[in-house]
Amino acid sequence: SNTSTVHRRVALAVAAMWREQLGVITELRNEEWKVFVANRRQRRETEVFRGGWIADYDDAGSFLDLFATGSPLNWSGFADAEYERLLGAARAASDPDERARLRGEAEARLLDAHPIVPLYFYTSKHLVSPRLRGFEPNPLDRHPSRFLRFAE
C-alpha cells in the first residue's frame, strides 16, 4: 500500500523542508495504491508524487526503461528523443562496457531533465555466518531457504 507510515513520514519531512527552506506550501494527499495508480494512468493533476521501484533484475534498464516513452509506468510523462536513442543503443550493444556507458549517459540525461528526484534508497543488512552457503545478495533481498545450507 502507498499509505504506509514510512511513506507518510518521508512526505511530512519533505513538506517541512520545502516550507522552511523554500517557502513552498504543500497539501499532502494519501491514496490507496489502486487509487494512486489510476490517478497516474489518467494523468490527474498532481505536481509531485512519491513513487518507488526495486530492480527485479540486475541491470540499470530495470530503472531506466521505466521512463521510456510509452512505458506504462512512466507516470512523470517524461519524453526525450536523445534518451530514447541512448536506451535503444544500450539494448542493442553486445559489449557490456559500451552498454554501461550508454546507460550512464541515459541516466545523466534523465537526472538533468528532473522528472524525478531521488530521495532515498532502500538498503538491507544481514549478518551471515561464514559457514552458510547459498546466501546471495540480490536486488529483491529474497533468500529462499531451499538454497541455504551450512558447511561442515
Predicted segments with their positions:
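Short beta-strand-to-loop elements that line the ligand-binding cleft
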Residues: 25-32
